[in-house]
Structure formats: structure tokens, C-alpha cells
UniProtKB/Swiss-Prot annotation:
PROSITE patterns per UniProt: RRM
Gene Ontology BP term (one): spermatogenesis
Entry protein name: Dead end protein homolog 1
Functional note: RNA-binding factor that positively regulates gene expression by prohibiting miRNA-mediated gene suppression. Relieves miRNA repression in germline cells. Prohibits the function of several miRNAs by blocking the accessibility of target mRNAs. Sequence-specific RNA-binding factor that binds specifically to U-rich regions (URRs) in the 3' untranslated region (3'-UTR) of several mRNAs. Does not bind to miRNAs. May play a role during primordial germ cell (PGC) survival. However, does not seem to be essential for PGC migration.
Provenance organism: Homo sapiens
Domain RRM: 58-136, 140-213
Lineage summary: Eukaryota, Metazoa, Chordata, Craniata, Vertebrata
Coiled coil: none
Length: 353
């Protein structure tokens, strides 16, 4: 087994010419490069920067890099087209780059100029660069939260993460156990990365629970969006007068009745509920599969929901239908309609939203 010193000596022997050229360039220019979590970074902000960070859309992705290329060749090239706010070169343990980097400009115009000028630029013979718009990761998923956690309690627990948090949503966890998943949206990739680091270094405990903190994956985001909103994102929206009339007529009659009247006003027909109990979890939570068929809509609305049954002996399927109605009304509200029904099920029913 190699010792630590053996590994260091091996790394020093990898690409020594370019490493020496980089060190000479750093000494001559006085530029400061910082190694952080597998990447070497310049700026963020650069010397003399005043004001807020650049807006979203000001960063480009740089691919197809030869692995022995360093900042002394890349930063001057990308500074030709605009002022750099930050440059990040992804690094391996051996000191070679990982084949890609990110350049963030002071404005979107700089990023557009880099794409127009440097995409397919021949850094070396038969080695054209790939330069395209960077899609910044600004969203995290936090899975494993308690079923009864409220959004206000979650926001209170997230306060130490700083002012970069822009949006927090609580949704039913896609996992098999009762629980919730939080989707957190931040103002920038840096703010999201700092929050992720803080949560992970805190042994991934939040609200007293062991949670899984990850970058929000596109497939998970799509699955949760379909579960929450489903086909109603494409549904015609009722007029404001119809919504007001539904609210005035129903008062506190119940979420299912509200949904029924709303569908009538939208000329969609009466919703038909199908439910199936899939099992019972801890603390009396019941997991239901549901499907709601609305005659005037081509696609049914389906998903999973957890409910706790009331003590008045109501049938579990009826409780689940009420809870599903609340979810559908909230989905309609979030997709553009006014809120018809306050968040929560009928009196005495606990619902995992």
C-alpha cells in the first residue's frame, strides 16, 4: 500500500511543465486561486468588485478541455470577451483537470459573447472547446421530514441557512414511509451549495429527524409536480366570478363539495373517486392510492396520500377522498386559480400535505 508521501510524489510527477507554467503565471499576475471541494476557483467576487453578484444566466459551461490545461491558458482567453466574475476549474486528485470548467461573467452579455466567440475555439489542433449556457443548480431536496411538520416550522428551522432561500415547499415523500419532502429554491448556486454543506455537516438532522439532502434531480422534480398538480396544469381555469360564487355558496360544507361545484362551473362533470388502502404506517397513518376521473378532462389525476383516521368512525376511504379533494383544490390554486379551500382537511382529519 502506498504511503501518503508516495502519493504526493506521484502527483508532483504528473504534468510538471504546465504546473510550473501555472505557478509562474500566478506569481507574475498576482492572481489568487483557491482550491475548494474538488475545484480551483478564481474570483467570486474578483478584486475590486462592488455590488451584488451577477444575475442568473451570466455563467457558461466549458467542456472538452484537455486534462493538462490550467488557468494560465484559460482565464486570459475567456477574459477577452468580457469581465470575469468567477472562474472554476474542476480538478482531480492527481492535479489534472476533469475536462470541464465554469466561467461566470459580470453580466449576461459577457456570457453570450463567450458562447458566440469561443464555442468551437481550437484551443489545440483537433480540440475545439464546447462553450454553452450553464444551468445553475439552485434547488435542493430534503427528504425524511416528519409527516406533521408545517411550512412555518420548516422555515424557522431553515433560518440559519441565511437569506439566500427564496422558496420552500412541503410535499408528500415519494418513499414508502410516512414523511414529507421539502423542495428548497435558492437565489444562486453558491447559496444552495452553502446550504447543502451546512445541512450535511450538521449530520443531516433537521426538525429532529435524519434527512437526506441532495441536489433536486429533474426526474424527481417532474414526478412530484405530476403528483401534486397532475393534468390540472393544462385545465381551463374558471372565471373569478365562478370561484367567488363557489366560495360564497359553500361556506364550510367541505372540500369535496367545493371540488364538485367547481367542476360543474367549469363544465367538466362530476369527479369520480377511486381509492385503495395500501397499508398502515406508524402512529396510525394510512397510505392510500387514489385516482380521480373527471369526465370533461382527458387524463385522470392520480397519486398517493397519507391520512390519519378520525375517532368518529368515518370510513377510511371517505377520509382519503376528502384529503384528495383538498390536494386538488390546492393544485388548482397554485396553477393560477384563486384559493377555494384553506389548506387542511375537514375538522378532525389529519392530512399529510
Amino acid at each position: 500500500m502506498q504511503s501518503k508521501r508516495d502519493c504526493e510524489l506521484w502527483c508532483e510527477r504528473v504534468n510538471p511543465e504546465n504546473k510550473a507554467a501555472l505557478e509562474a503565471w500566478v506569481r507574475e499576475t498576482g492572481i489568487r486561486l483557491v482550491q475548494v471541494n474538488g475545484q480551483r476557483k478564481y474570483g467570486g467576487p474578483p478584486p475590486g468588485w462592488v455590488g451584488s453578484p451577477p444575475p442568473a444566466g451570466s455563467e457558461v459551461f466549458i467542456g472538452r478541455l484537455p486534462q493538462d490545461v490550467y488557468e494560465h491558458q484559460l482565464i486570459p482567453l475567456f477574459q477577452r470577451v468580457g469581465r470575469l466574475y468567477e472562474f472554476r476549474l474542476m480538478m482531480t486528485f492527481s492535479g489534472l483537470n476533469r475536462g470541464f470548467a465554469y466561467a461566470r461573467y459580470s453580466s449576461r452579455r459577457g456570457a453570450q459573447a463567450a458562447i458566440a466567440t469561443l464555442h468551437n475555439h481550437p484551443l489545440r489542433p483537433s480540440c475545439p472547446l464546447l462553450v454553452c449556457r450553464s444551468t445553475e443548480k439552485c434547488e435542493l431536496s430534503v427528504d425524511g421530514l416528519p409527516p406533521n411538520l408545517t411550512r412555518s416550522a420548516l422555515l424557522l428551522a431553515l433560518q440559519p441557512l441565511g437569506p439566500g432561500l427564496q422558496e420552500a415547499r412541503l410535499l408528500p415523500s415519494p418513499g414508502p414511509a410516512p414523511g414529507q419532502i421539502a423542495l428548497l429554491k435558492f437565489s444562486s448556486h453558491r447559496a444552495a451549495a452553502m446550504a447543502k454543506k451546512a445541512l450535511v455537516e450538521g449530520q443531516s438532522h433537521l426538525c429532529g429527524e435524519q434527512v437526506a439532502v441532495e441536489w433536486l434531480k429533474p426526474d424527481l422534480k417532474q414526478r412530484l409536480r405530476q403528483q401534486l398538480v397532475g393534468p390540472f396544469l393544462r385545465s381551463p381555469q374558471p372565471e373569478g366570478s365562478q370561484l367567488a360564487l363557489a366560495r360564497d355558496k359553500l361556506g364550510f360544507q367541505g372540500a369535496r363539495a367545493t371540488l364538485q361545484l367547481l367542476c360543474q362551473r367549469m363544465k367538466l362533470g362530476s369527479p369520480v373517486f377511486l381509492t385503495k388502502c395500501l397499508g398502515i404506517g406508524p402512529a396510525g397513518w394510512h397510505r392510500f392510492w387514489y385516482q380521480v376521473v373527471i369526465p370533461g378532462h382527458p387524463v385522470p389525476f392520480s397519486g398517493l396520500i397519507w391520512v390519519v383516521l378520525t375517532l368518529d368512525g368515518r370510513d377510511g376511504h371517505e377520509v382519503a377522498k376528502d384529503a384528495v379533494s383538498v390536494r386538488l383544490l390546492q393544485a388548482l390554486s397554485e396553477s393560477g386559480a384563486n384559493l377555494l379551500w384553506s389548506a387542511g382537511a375537514e375538522a378532525g382529519t389529519m392530512v399529510k400535505q
